[in-house]
Amino acid sequence: MRSILQLRVPQIAGDEDQLRGLKIETTAASSPSVVRFRDPQIEMAHGAGGKASRRLVEGLFAPLLYPASREPLSDAAHLEVGGARIAFTTDSFVVKPLHFPGGSIGELAVNGTMNDLAVSGAKGIAMTVTFVLEEGLPTADLEAEVRAMSGALKRAGVVMAGGDTKVVERGKADGMYITTAGIGTPLPGVKVDARSVRPGDKILLSGPIGDHGITILLARGELDFEADLYSDTRSVLPLVEALAAECGPGIHWMRDPTRGGVATALNELARDSGLGIELLEEEIPMHDAVRGACELLGLDPLHIANEGQFLAVVSPEYAAIALNSLQQTAGGEEARIVGQVRVEPANAVLVITRYGGSRIVDMLVGDPLPRIC
């Protein structure tokens, strides 16, 4: 891969002294070199972002690739090299179909990568892309995705720094897969860490849940159900920047609830913080079409993927300010305070239903909606 962008980060490549001083602040938690993953083979659920994914990462990848780290899992790594700070992330996109109401794989690849940086407390500045293309893919389809990606880059103010292309035999890639990497610069005054979360903190959600996952399901024609529904794929950076400007020191944690949905993201927070999460079901914004589809299929909307929303945990004194900043920013009009952090139930998420009851909601188990991003 050839890079066409020179970054103003001192001597990251080629300087052994600087590389020895590389500090990775956010990677995966593990016990050094102890491989605990015992599943006999890889299943679709291992890529769904839920329990099986976490078991794979913590049991196999983390012990061998990050043996010295004790940091919680995060959407991006924040690196310090010679006094300069950058954020770094990587992602892959295998969504099926390639085009869907409200977006496509190319636009999703840019937005998803930049959103991982945004919720880590950074503004994306550059990315790279690798296309894995299937032999026989119509050139018009590829051009459409590159154009979609170009548009998303311009809207985000991000430079494409380089890329690579591979072609595999017919029938081996379902059209195309896209892998990205992104770098960004930290937002001033924002430091998110699950270990900073405290009992009494408030949980905010930027908008309606489930649009993306249900849109993809409908686009596949697998459900005899019609709805005027669109993927929510978009950049969340404007909302994150608005939140940071008003209450940066009060932001303790952020996450975009993609694979595995809101339930999985908040279960990860509960386990990484050792605290409990209380969600108010009646406060969670959701379109009627999403609710109806989930009821028809027996799915929990809290497990459905989103691609243009994010969760934020803020200290209670900033809650009203944070909510107002989101609701006054384009795309955040339906933001809500949806819950709070509690001491109990430790390491778990408790949903208070609209009827006054309660239930524990766990991480996603299995993969009810595969390849949604």
Model-identified regions with their sequence ranges:
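Helix-biased detector of long, well-ordered alpha-helical tracts
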Residues: 2-373
